[in-house]
Amino acid sequence: SRDAAASPQVAGRTLGGYLFVPLELALVAAFYYATNRWLGWWQPSEVLTDPNILGSAVPALTPIAVSLQAGFMEESVFRAIPLSLGALIGARYGHRTLGIALAVLVQALIFGGAHANYPGFPAYSRPVELFLPAIVWALIFLRFGLLPTILLHATFDLTLFSIPVFLVDAPGARVQQGLVIAAALVPLAAIAVRRWQAGAWRELPDALRNGAWRPGAEAPEAQPAPTTALAIGRASNAFQHALPVLGIAGVIAWVAFAPFHADVPPLRIDRAEAIAAADAALAAQGMTLGPGWQRFATVKLASDDPQQWAWHKYVWREAGPDAYRKLVGTILAPPVWEVRYAMFGGDVVERAEEWRVAITNDRAVRAMSHSLPEARPGAHLTRDDALALARKALKTRFDVDASPLKLVAADQQQRPARTDWSFIFGDSRIFVGAGGEARYAVAVSGDEVSGAGRFVYVPEAWTRGERELDNRLQVVALAGVAVFFAAALAALVVGILGWVRHRVDTRALAIVFAVTFILALLSVANAWPGIAMQLSTTEPLASQLTMKILGGIASALVGALLAGLCAGVGAFGARTSPSLLRIGRWPAVVAAVAAGAFVVGLQATLSALATPEAPTWPGAPWISQAWPLAGAVLSGVGFIGLASAELFVVYVVSRLTRGFTQRLWLAVAIVLALEFAAALAQGRANVPGALVSGGIAGVVASGVLLLLLRYDPRLVPAFAATIVVMGGAIKAAQAAALLPLAIDAIVTIAIAVWYTRFLRREPSTAAASYREA
């Protein structure tokens, strides 16, 4: 404002933001010099700039835009929000200073971790580098406010990011440099203009200081929670009374049309059997691994690998489903166990050596690869000698005679102490689709066959068409992400407002928060095999695990907070709504179960009418986990979060439509958007199919919401549990995981029963006090 900008307080904070920049640059330079010289750390400063900006039409715009984004967004997220929350929470419990101190430390750790993707050694160098600056910036914020930290951050980044612009001597370079300087001086220019307009420096009015704000008197709610039942219309009444019949029809349709069988056979061997088969395969190669080697195994699916999935989709569409099913297990990979052998101790160079063995359902070796350190000495074979070795490997590993095959490519890679070769052979005898070709790849490291595999060559025109389609659909996928982000933000805002206005069930919030947090931590621990497969042997194991653990805890806290807020708000809305105990001769819960069965059956029927764009693959939701049966239990308990989210959606839609009396189109739009987003999240490998299933689910769920659930949100857990159990049965049948399915289903139903009974109890104190107000 004009009064604020013309004050010495704002001018001083603006100048202070600029003056801190050289101090910060000096601190960074000193840190790099000291750690690189005396500690042997590696932190390349060139990664702080990007010379590629010079290839853009206006090179100055990129550093300006990125710096502004970082200054405003990061200072708000990493300084203003956590430090303010620390002060508020600390004051709430009588320890304001302690709350602020803890927030200062936490924001510094998170800020450093959020920037740890920069290259550097050791892996924790970047968080250590940013810890002290983050502390300093937090103290600046606490003393002077957000203005100097935003200016400091934005100008600091602009100085680094614009370095390439000032290293160029070309036509137009001075214009770009002038734009950068002008952008950096805009805050000072604003101060100067306001000072000139005011004619003199003016004291900052007390009304413009942060301390002048006072919370206003709490306004009464314009529309309290409904205490009388909604009038059931003719259409709703007919639908509700027809639900038992519709539910039976849904079950019949589900049995008749649901894809209980995948197009490829599921894995039936467990992790121990796969590791034993891989050990035997290495022993057959004459390899004896010492005690320093660690073994990890997880299920590998083609549908999880974009490159492999492109081969599978190409054969499915171009050669046909029958040909596809015949090729799965030969040229095309079936579901396999991938066993990894790696070392995390000893010499860092030698730790680059790894073995990976893919084991199929019959305990046969699908593929075996041996990654060698680049400097490992070996033979220098000629092309002919290496080719002879590769042809022999085709016979021994795949039982394929190499004589009829066509040599497509032969590449040589010269290593420091050996020569590596890679060969690709084409097999035109196997039909994989017009223009495609079945191929074999063999890698020779020195005189050792270090890898061999099979794949499908896909024509460039087909790949380009798929890429263009994916690019167009990427907008839809991003829209799905935006929907989830908006939903999470809505949960946070509505939950906080509900807390402030006493429109939240604190008991439900606490229970769901605790359960979800513990569940998330246990799920991360149970997912250890998958995490271990991604660990790098060239980085310290302790630092990697520390980052994984801290990231898991942070994610668990955020997820638990959102789930708890959804539960508190959703349970409040449900428990302050009139109860619908019976529909005709049936209990209302039975009608909710029938509605869920009807939805699943209708989805299965309509989905069966569409031509599949890709093969159906069995999932591996439990088998890859460390303890599959424990994973089934955790999956069932996780239903509490889904039920809370759906209760929250019903509550929010009810508020936006004034108790489902106005703007019903908005209710349909919200449900459609959420169903589309959920389908895209679950079906990333088949976006068109996900859009179809999401549209069907959205339309049907909207109908059930308007015709049944709006009259009593307490029916949501039973309705949602039915859909989850029946949908999970399809995936479990495809994966031949009936025992985990049974455990998951039992726990899910138990959670749904508990949640329904919880919602039917007398409202909590918070809810009761609201109704009395």
Language model segments and positions:
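Membrane-interfacial, low-structure loops and terminal tails that flank and connect transmembrane helices
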Residues: 1-17, 91, 198-238, 570-590, ...
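Core alpha-helical transmembrane segments of integral membrane proteins
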Residues: 1-55, 59-62, 74, 80, ...
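Membrane-interfacial loop-to-transmembrane alpha-helix junctions, especially the N-terminal start
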Residues: 14, 96-101, 146-149, 204-209, ...
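Transmembrane helix-loop-helix hairpins at the membrane interface
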Residues: 56-205, 622-763
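Exposed beta-strand-loop-beta-strand "reactive/processing" segments of non-cytosolic proteins
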Residues: 254-257, 284-361, 405-446
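Alpha-helical transmembrane signal-anchor/signal-peptide segments
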Residues: 259-279
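Long, charged/polar, surface-exposed segments that mediate recognition or autoinhibition
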Residues: 272, 282, 286-288, 340-347, ...
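Short, aromatic-rich amphipathic segments at membrane interfaces
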Residues: 448-479
